[in-house]
Amino acid sequence: MFGKQTKSELVYLCPAMRLIVFICGFLGLLTLSSLMKPSGDTPGVRAAMDHFKSDALSFAASCTRLKKAAEAGNREKTRLALIDCRCRYKGIEAFLEYFFRSSATIYNRAPKYEAEEGGMEYQSPIGMQLIESMLFDPHPDKKNLLQQVDAVESAALDLPALLYNLHADDRQILESMRIELIRIMALDITGYEAPLLKSGIRESEVALTTFEEQLQLYLGDDPSSDSMRLYSGKASDLLHNKSFDDFDRLSFLRDAMLPLQHQFGLFIREHGVVLNTSKTMNYAADDLFSPNALLPEKFPGGDSGIAMIQLGKQLFNDKRLSGNGQKSCASCHDPAKGFTDQLPVSIGFDGHQRLDRNAPTLLYSAYQFDQFWDGRAKSLEQQIRTVLHDTREMHADSVKESDVLAIASYVRSLHPFNSPFDRYIRRENSALSTAAIKGANLFMGKAQCATCHFIPVFNGLIPPDYAITEFEVLGTTSNDSLTGKNLHLSADQGRYSQYQLDFFKGAFKTPTVRNAGLTPPYMHNGAFTHWRPL
């Protein structure tokens, strides 16, 4: 009996064991199904609400301590109190930002004006990020600082009341957790929300701990979820007691967070509790750096079929579209030059006149909600029509709408996601040199480049929703001289030329820096021919 046995013999000899295995498996599925339901009151939902209530009180208490520190006028103690506030906020962030987005804006909004272009209404900066900038101002306005702190504290004290009459389900809780993983990877570890305090690693640890506590309730004792526990634990270990400047973000992403995101997505799908309220994200993708993580068809414009893409490629290179038969789209957006012309500013229709701005790459341009440097076009189709009709550019005699749609389909397809960085993230160890790995960590960390050039497209598409294209006021110079008498700001007003709001003066769209080695010179006016001064 204890000798070599075939599979059929084992089945025959152990009917009782088969029954036990079946019952255990059934009970395990029953337990998980009781924890997760598409709707209704479940242990997962109750735990999330209880956690929110408890941590909201903790956050409110930290806001009160922040207020006392600010009133005392000790800047260093106030900064430390703000770090404590920010960390405690991370305990409620996933739930608050998901269920109460408008209420959340008072706490952690970017310290800039936000405008609704239709009616040109705008919201003034407010919240912890603005408080941070004030605490690092050499000459802060104490009255304004105290007003900001008081506004945050007053709102925080009322947080538990938000739960009144809230109806949530497990699908929503799990989606809020999914979004929080993206927030950790794309915002927290880069320093986007606290660039001066540099508390992003500590904040990430709190956010991940909150995620793990909620996750454990859903996993229970299910052994099939051991991989999730493994990657979550590894992510926590990598974050623990690490400084912001020295943190290895590539290892954190590649070895822990991206696999965790993948396994978490599988878990949600396998248990039939998928909910996707995102405008752009593809939850069927493996992870944030998968080529299909963002869906081009979810951005402005139409769907791109193969036939349309092929026709669009032909038209893109066809000089007959121009009024004089001398220029094509490829004249300024040459595929061999990263879909640019590598000139400071492009040459116009007549072959002599210089245009006003640099020709940006068309690679990954599908992943934007605004086209042109000033964002005056809301789709690739609108951009293409504008260029074809412009007397300084293509000066076309007539334009067929079918041609516009075809060219847009081709341009929309230009997102290869096959750079050495992409291959390294996909665990091709030899794809990046040691120097490049160091550079990527600096880019996403100490240098804070990724606070404007957000992962995974490395452009101004803002995480975690990826539903807004960001514009920045950098004070771009007219040349590459950054000091002395040759230092002059660019006269180009950027987005202000479209929307006459003072905070749009000098604002330009943040372009992708993918394949940037092929696309010099840089900035809207091509003022920088090399990376070093930039």
Which residues fall in each region the model found?
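Post-cleavage N-terminal segment of exported redox proteins
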Residues: 22-41, 234-308, 368, 373, ...
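Short regulatory "switch" loops immediately downstream of catalytic or recognition motifs
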Residues: 1-3, 492
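Short, low-complexity, charge-dense intrinsically disordered segments
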Residues: 4-7, 13, 20, 24-27
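Extracytoplasmic redox metalloprotein regions
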Residues: 106-167, 171, 314-322, 327-328, ...
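Soluble non-cytosolic domains of exported or imported proteins
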Residues: 53, 57, 72, 76, ...
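Short glycine/threonine-rich turn/loop motifs
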Residues: 283-386, 424-533
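Mature extracytoplasmic or organellar-lumen-exposed domains after removal of signal/transit peptides
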Residues: 39-291
